[in-house]
């Protein structure tokens, strides 16, 4: 059995999705992700992962502050439904910055959820826009709407970097061609849709255990996601190590193998020793859980 029992509830829609429901869904996703145990290199119930400045309590405190902001993202998406999607992104930025400031105040200046604010702010706004247009709230529609919000963002924000000081995102793109969270959003969470969600869905069908399903999904994300958090901490060598080790564990069966959970704990210890934390994959895992509450819908909706 896995370390924590979590019971998912797929949303059965009989009325339009409300902002309050989005807030609740994001809160569940963030808490589910951080409490899932064992997660290699990441904060969980077992330990603080490869972090000295944050722990489970700081993530829970951050979640309590961040989740309510999703109502504002939802309303912004709803009220700008007539605005071109590429223009909405600029309108969302001040909301995101204010949310981030509240997070930093709650955590004493520690960045617990910056990536999650970016991802879930976009998804919440996408949900609001779909509700305003009377469209179904489905996985593919939500992700496609995020892609429309973010169209052209990577080239505009990363490829034209100037000046002497580059942000981490700019440096990763210019040096390695890695687009990070921006690229994932602009693609409409392609890694989630093509890697994570199929694994999670299959594991739920086979085991009925959401914890095992999420842990196996996390391994797949760590194996294939070009996580720029890992590059920031360990360079390309750190990213390659994590990907290769995750792939090795998957070849052995992952969490379904004999001793699979113990292998994850050992992987956790190794990443802590190497100071490697796959925070980007953790964010995508939370997105996977959030999206799993909604029907997939058509891949190319009309």
Curated annotation (Swiss-Prot):
Question: Which Pfam families does the record associate with it?
Answer: CitG (PF01874)
Can the keyword ATP-binding be found in this entry's annotation? Answer: yes
Name the UniProt record assigns to this protein: 2-(5''-triphosphoribosyl)-3'-dephosphocoenzyme-A synthase
**Coiled-coil region(s):** none
- Catalytic activity line of the entry: 3'-dephospho-CoA + ATP = 2'-(5''-triphospho-alpha-D-ribosyl)-3'-dephospho-CoA + adenine
Instruction: Give the keywords, sorted.
Output: ATP-binding, Nucleotide-binding, Transferase
Its Gene Ontology biological processes?
prosthetic group biosynthetic process
Q: Which gene encodes it?
A: citG
Write down the superkingdom of origin.
Bacteria
**Function statement:** Catalyzes the formation of 2-(5''-triphosphoribosyl)-3'-dephosphocoenzyme-A, the precursor of the prosthetic group of the holo-acyl carrier protein (gamma chain) of citrate lyase, from ATP and dephospho-CoA.
Q: Which family does it belong to?
A: Belongs to the CitG/MdcB family.
Q: What EC number(s) would the UniProt record show?
A: 2.4.2.52
Q: Which NCBIfam families does this chain map to?
A: citrate_citG
């Amino acid at each position: 059995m896995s370390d924590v029992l979590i019971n998912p509830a797929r949303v059965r829609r009989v009325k339009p999705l409300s902002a309050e429901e989005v807030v609740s869904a994001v809160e569940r996703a963030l808490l589910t992700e951080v409490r899932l145990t064992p997660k290699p290199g990441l904060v969980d119930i077992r330990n603080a992962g490869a972090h000295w400045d944050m722990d489970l309590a700081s993530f829970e405190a951050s979640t309590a502050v961040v989740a309510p902001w999703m109502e504002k993202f939802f309303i912004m998406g709803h009220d700008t439904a007539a605005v071109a999607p590429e223009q909405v992104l600029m309108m969302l930025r001040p909301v995101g910055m204010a949310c981030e400031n509240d997070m930093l105040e709650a955590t004493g200046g520690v960045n617990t959820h910056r990536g999650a604010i970016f991802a879930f702010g976009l998804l919440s706004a996408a949900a609001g826009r779909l509700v305003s247009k009377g469209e179904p709230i489905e996985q593919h529609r939500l992700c496609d709407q995020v892609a429309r919000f973010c169209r052209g963002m990577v080239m505009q924000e990363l490829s034209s970097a100037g000046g002497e000081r580059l942000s981490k995102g700019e440096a990763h793109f210019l040096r390695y061609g890695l687009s990070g969270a921006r690229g994932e959003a602009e693609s409409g969470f392609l890694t989630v849709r093509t890697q994570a969600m199929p694994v999670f869905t299959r594991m739920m069908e086979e085991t009925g255990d959401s914890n095992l399903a999420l842990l196996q999904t996390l391994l797949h994300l760590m194996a294939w996601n070009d996580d720029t958090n890992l590059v920031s901490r360990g360079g390309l060598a750190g990213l390659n190590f994590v990907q290769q080790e995750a792939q090795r564990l998957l070849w052995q069966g992952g969490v379904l193998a004999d001793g699979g959970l113990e292998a994850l704990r050992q992987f956790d210890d190794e990443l802590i020793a190497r100071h490697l934390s796959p925070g980007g994959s953790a964010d995508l895992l939370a997105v996977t859980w959030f999206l799993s509450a909604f029907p997939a819908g058509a891949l190319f909706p009309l």
